[in-house]
């Protein structure tokens, strides 16, 4: 003892002596309970900690480390972990109580003490945080025993970067995380500075340092630190976001999940929107308090479905009728919801059965369940209801009960009169009101009819060849043009006839006989005329004049056709004229029986005029026409002008538009015979069309006349022709002249003067290419006129 007292002022000597001293056991071993006084001399490591003073504070707790430290760095628990019965001489009797106390102390964290420190040297590198004792099993939470993503502890709480959750540190929303290096509870602990310190998952002082994986193992919730402590002062980096880890049962996510689970189990708790619970509890009757805690009514599911359908119908527009959901006051019929069974006494007023249906099976709304009816009503309201009057059920197009709004006549509605889910369901008396087709359908039909042409009553029957009427081509009654001829064929025939000229006449084809004229073909004989061929003398094309052989000189024919057209527009026809070739004895060149210029009827004359033309007509022509006219003033004296009768002009107009114009002057010509001039429609539509087509084709390729005897005819007058190739108007004549019509003129006109011959166009050729059928007279001889 003297040695120890003398060595006390010298710490080095004291340390040396303490290291070589051996414990003596005069009175036993230190007690099992911390704070017990050991027997004998000082035991190494006991220091001041075993006496409850020195390094121990009040209650046996170690003092907080400060710069300079206090003497004694151990935990101060002593070596009291062994039961007293082990070594005799213990102050406290050994036994079961001591063993239990030792186990409890070990479990509480007393455990074995740390390595003893040297007094007066401050805090050593010994453990600071109490560790689990020998009786504690490895922790189940990651971070205790095995390094994990987040620190150990019972539950994650407020974090201390680099330290983790410490035992005994309160957790909750009021604790804020502390960043190292900026102060706080762990600002002065070695290894917990701004450089990062121990990594998450390793409590302070743990003997094993596990490396930290960058990014927190890729989990969404970490401490928010960059790997290995990188980052400004421990501020949360890109490795993750700070917060409670998932799957631990705490934090806002867990709270939200728990709330959702509770809401799903017990209901949302909000006030119900759908009616059905208030009042006396009758299903379907609107109550004072709609719904109970979010439970939509207590009635049948039909109420909810009907309410949803009503909401949808209100959104897109309710079907016309009573106000949806209003009290049913609209008309109802017995058996239809709202008046009979079901109706009065159905949900809300009497027997609380199915809403809007009354006694099941005894009423109409058809066979459809309320759910289906409500769904159908919503769909109809969404896409637009079809107007009609029905009784209920699925759409029908007839008359009867049951049916979603139909097009027939019915009574009921969808299913009832009142509201949803009131007394009658979706209100209405006739479904969606209306009897006819919807405006949309009518508009679509009108548009289609306008696009393709609506069938309606024709204005006029039309003058399709062979069919009575006035305006050609206008559809008749019901859109069928004419009477007998199909519209398409008749219109086509009319157009073609108008192009080439109609063949007016009276017989089967224009004229009187089978074809123009009376005979088989033009005239009566083999070909135009009655005898051998037109005229009497040598006909053009046989020997002298062109026409029968090569078809004439094309250029001359064209010029003659133009002159004929001009003359025709300025001339006025005599009696029996009309469209060229219609009167008896008048026709297209070379068709009459008599002689003269080709195609003249009784008497001579320039083609195209009947016998009634006079000097006044001739004098109305242009000088160029009078110069080549054999019946001009060189042969006839001036005579008073007789009234001009428009014939050819109307014929030209008729030929242009193809319409059969009634003859201006029918009846007898002076010498022209008895024709039925102008526009008398043929006997049959098909024959008229065929004749028009044949005439047009004949005019297109030119008529071939046969040779005849030119010359005088009978006294200059000739035998009256029996027809003429009627129906080929000037347009057809011009067409024939274009392709070269066979000239059928004689050598000269009649003998002497032309008796009352008309003056008109000059188709065909005689001796002279300038004036067909006549000699070269005057200064026009040899000249070509346009």
Swiss-Prot record:
<feature type="modified residue" description="Hydroxyproline; partial">
    <location>
        <position position="167"/>
    </location>
</feature>
<dbReference type="GO" id="GO:0007519">
    <property type="term" value="P:skeletal muscle tissue development"/>
</dbReference>
<dbReference type="GO" id="GO:0031012">
    <property type="term" value="C:extracellular matrix"/>
</dbReference>
<dbReference type="GO" id="GO:0030833">
    <property type="term" value="P:regulation of actin filament polymerization"/>
</dbReference>
<feature type="modified residue" description="Allysine">
    <location>
        <position position="656"/>
    </location>
</feature>
<feature type="modified residue" description="Hydroxyproline; partial">
    <location>
        <position position="290"/>
    </location>
</feature>
<feature type="modified residue" description="4-hydroxyproline; partial">
    <location>
        <position position="481"/>
    </location>
</feature>
<feature type="modified residue" description="Hydroxyproline; partial">
    <location>
        <position position="352"/>
    </location>
</feature>
<feature type="modified residue" description="Allysine">
    <location>
        <position position="735"/>
    </location>
</feature>
<feature type="compositionally biased region" description="Low complexity">
    <location>
        <begin position="630"/>
        <end position="645"/>
    </location>
</feature>
<feature type="modified residue" description="Allysine">
    <location>
        <position position="492"/>
    </location>
</feature>
<feature type="modified residue" description="4-hydroxyproline; partial">
    <location>
        <position position="327"/>
    </location>
</feature>
<feature type="signal peptide">
    <location>
        <begin position="1"/>
        <end position="26"/>
    </location>
</feature>
<protein>
    <recommendedName>
        <fullName>Elastin</fullName>
    </recommendedName>
</protein>
<feature type="modified residue" description="4-hydroxyproline; partial">
    <location>
        <position position="360"/>
    </location>
</feature>
<feature type="modified residue" description="4-hydroxyproline; partial">
    <location>
        <position position="677"/>
    </location>
</feature>
<feature type="modified residue" description="Allysine">
    <location>
        <position position="315"/>
    </location>
</feature>
<feature type="modified residue" description="Allysine">
    <location>
        <position position="562"/>
    </location>
</feature>
<feature type="modified residue" description="Allysine">
    <location>
        <position position="265"/>
    </location>
</feature>
<feature type="modified residue" description="Allysine">
    <location>
        <position position="558"/>
    </location>
</feature>
<keyword id="KW-0964">Secreted</keyword>
<dbReference type="GO" id="GO:0003180">
    <property type="term" value="P:aortic valve morphogenesis"/>
</dbReference>
<feature type="modified residue" description="4-hydroxyproline">
    <location>
        <position position="598"/>
    </location>
</feature>
<feature type="modified residue" description="Allysine">
    <location>
        <position position="107"/>
    </location>
</feature>
<feature type="modified residue" description="Hydroxyproline; partial">
    <location>
        <position position="88"/>
    </location>
</feature>
<feature type="modified residue" description="4-hydroxyproline; partial">
    <location>
        <position position="347"/>
    </location>
</feature>
<dbReference type="GO" id="GO:0048660">
    <property type="term" value="P:regulation of smooth muscle cell proliferation"/>
</dbReference>
<feature type="modified residue" description="Allysine">
    <location>
        <position position="653"/>
    </location>
</feature>
<dbReference type="GO" id="GO:0050840">
    <property type="term" value="F:extracellular matrix binding"/>
</dbReference>
<feature type="modified residue" description="Allysine">
    <location>
        <position position="738"/>
    </location>
</feature>
<feature type="modified residue" description="4-hydroxyproline; partial">
    <location>
        <position position="580"/>
    </location>
</feature>
<keyword id="KW-0677">Repeat</keyword>
<comment type="function">
    <text>Major structural protein of tissues such as aorta and nuchal ligament, which must expand rapidly and recover completely. Molecular determinant of the late arterial morphogenesis, stabilizing arterial structure by regulating proliferation and organization of vascular smooth muscle.</text>
</comment>
<dbReference type="GO" id="GO:0085029">
    <property type="term" value="P:extracellular matrix assembly"/>
</dbReference>
<feature type="modified residue" description="Hydroxyproline; partial">
    <location>
        <position position="67"/>
    </location>
</feature>
<dbReference type="GO" id="GO:0005576">
    <property type="term" value="C:extracellular region"/>
</dbReference>
<feature type="disulfide bond">
    <location>
        <begin position="776"/>
        <end position="781"/>
    </location>
</feature>
<feature type="modified residue" description="Hydroxyproline; partial">
    <location>
        <position position="522"/>
    </location>
</feature>
<feature type="modified residue" description="4-hydroxyproline; partial">
    <location>
        <position position="286"/>
    </location>
</feature>
<feature type="modified residue" description="Allysine">
    <location>
        <position position="451"/>
    </location>
</feature>
<feature type="modified residue" description="Hydroxyproline; partial">
    <location>
        <position position="355"/>
    </location>
</feature>
<dbReference type="GO" id="GO:0009887">
    <property type="term" value="P:animal organ morphogenesis"/>
</dbReference>
């Amino acid at each position: 003892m003297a040695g120890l007292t003398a060595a006390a002022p010298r710490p080095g000597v004291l340390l040396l002596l303490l290291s070589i001293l051996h414990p003596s056991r005069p009175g036993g071993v230190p007690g099992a309970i911390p704070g017990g006084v050991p027997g004998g001399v000082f035991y190494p490591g006991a220091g001041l900690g075993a006496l409850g003073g020195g390094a121990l504070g009040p209650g046996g707790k170690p003092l907080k480390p400060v710069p300079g430290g206090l003497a004694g760095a151990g935990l101060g628990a002593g070596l009291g972990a062994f039961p007293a019965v082990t070594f005799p001489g213990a102050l406290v009797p050994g036994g079961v109580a001591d063993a239990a106390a030792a186990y409890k102390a070990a479990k509480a964290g007393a455990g074995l003490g740390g390595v003893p420190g040297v007094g007066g040297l401050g805090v050593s590198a010994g453990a600071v945080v109490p560790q689990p004792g020998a009786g504690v099993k490895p922790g189940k939470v990651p971070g205790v025993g095995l390094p994990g993503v987040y620190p150990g502890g019972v539950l994650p709480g407020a974090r201390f970067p680099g330290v983790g959750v410490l035992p005994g540190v309160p957790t909750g929303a009021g604790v804020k995380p502390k960043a190292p290096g900026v102060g706080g509870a762990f600002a002065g602990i070695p290894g917990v500075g701004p450089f990062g310190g121990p990594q998450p998952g390793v409590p302070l002082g743990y003997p094993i340092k596990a490396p930290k994986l960058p990014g927190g193992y890729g989990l969404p919730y970490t401490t928010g630190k960059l790997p290995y402590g990188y980052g400004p002062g421990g501020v949360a980096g890109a490795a993750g976001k700070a917060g409670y880890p998932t799957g631990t049962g705490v934090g806002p996510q867990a709270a939200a999940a728990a709330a959702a689970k509770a809401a799903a189990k017990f209901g949302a708790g909000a006030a119900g929107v759908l009616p059905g619970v208030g009042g006396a509890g009758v299903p379907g009757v609107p109550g004072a308090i709609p719904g109970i805690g979010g439970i939509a009514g207590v009635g049948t599911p039909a109420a909810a479905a009907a309410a949803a359908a009503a909401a949808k119908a209100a959104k897109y527009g309710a079907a016309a009728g009573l106000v949806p959901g209003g009290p049913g006051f609209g008309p109802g019929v017995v058996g239809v919801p709202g008046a009979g069974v079901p109706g009065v006494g159905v949900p809300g007023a009497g027997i609380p059965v199915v809403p809007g249906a009354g006694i099941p099976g005894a009423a109409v709304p058809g066979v459809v369940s309320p759910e289906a009816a409500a769904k159908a009503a919503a769909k109809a309201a969404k896409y637009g209801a079809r107007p009609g009057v029905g009784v209920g059920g699925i759409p029908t197009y007839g008359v009867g009960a049951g049916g979603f709004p139909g097009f027939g006549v019915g009574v009921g509605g969808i299913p009832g009169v009142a509201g949803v889910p009131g007394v009658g369901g979706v209100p209405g008396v006739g479904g969606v009101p209306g009897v006819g087709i919807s405006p949309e359908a009518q508009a679509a039909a009108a548009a289609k009819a306008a696009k393709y042409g609506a069938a309606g009553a024709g204005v006029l029957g039309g003058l399709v060849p062979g069919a009575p009427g006035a305006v050609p081509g206008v559809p008749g009654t019901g859109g069928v043009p004419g009477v007998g001829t199909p519209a398409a064929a008749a219109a086509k025939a009319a157009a073609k006839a108008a192009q080439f000229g109609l063949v007016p006449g009276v017989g089967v084809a224009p004229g009187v006989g089978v074809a123009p004229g009376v005979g088989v073909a033009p005239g009566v004989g083999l070909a135009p005329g009655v005898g051998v061929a037109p005229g009497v003398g040598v006909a053009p094309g046989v020997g002298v004049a062109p026409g029968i052989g090569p078809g004439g000189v094309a250029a001359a024919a064209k010029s003659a056709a133009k002159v004929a057209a001009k003359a025709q527009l300025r001339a006025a026809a005599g009696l029996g004229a009309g469209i060229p070739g219609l009167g008896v004895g008048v026709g297209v060149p070379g068709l009459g029986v008599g002689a003269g210029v080709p195609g003249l009827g009784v008497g001579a004359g320039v083609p195209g005029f009947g016998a009634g033309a006079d000097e006044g007509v001739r004098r109305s022509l242009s000088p160029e026409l009078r110069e080549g006219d054999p019946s001009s003033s060189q042969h006839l004296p001036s005579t008073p002008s007789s009234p001009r009768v428009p014939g050819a002009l109307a014929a030209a107009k008729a030929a242009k538009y193809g319409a059969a114009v009634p003859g201006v002057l029918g009846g007898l010509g002076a010498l022209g015979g008895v024709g039925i001039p102008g526009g008398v429609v043929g006997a049959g539509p098909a024959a008229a069309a065929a004749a028009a087509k044949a005439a047009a084709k004949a005019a297109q390729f030119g008529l071939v006349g046969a040779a005849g005897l030119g010359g005088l005819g009978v006294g200059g007058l000739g035998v009256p022709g029996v027809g003429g190739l009627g129906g080929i108007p000037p347009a057809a004549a011009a067409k024939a002249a274009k392709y070269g019509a066979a000239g059928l003129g004689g050598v000269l006109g009649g003998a002497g003067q032309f008796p009352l011959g008309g003056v008109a166009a000059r188709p065909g050729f005689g001796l002279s290419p300038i004036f067909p059928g006549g000699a070269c007279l005057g200064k026009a001889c040899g000249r070509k006129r346009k």
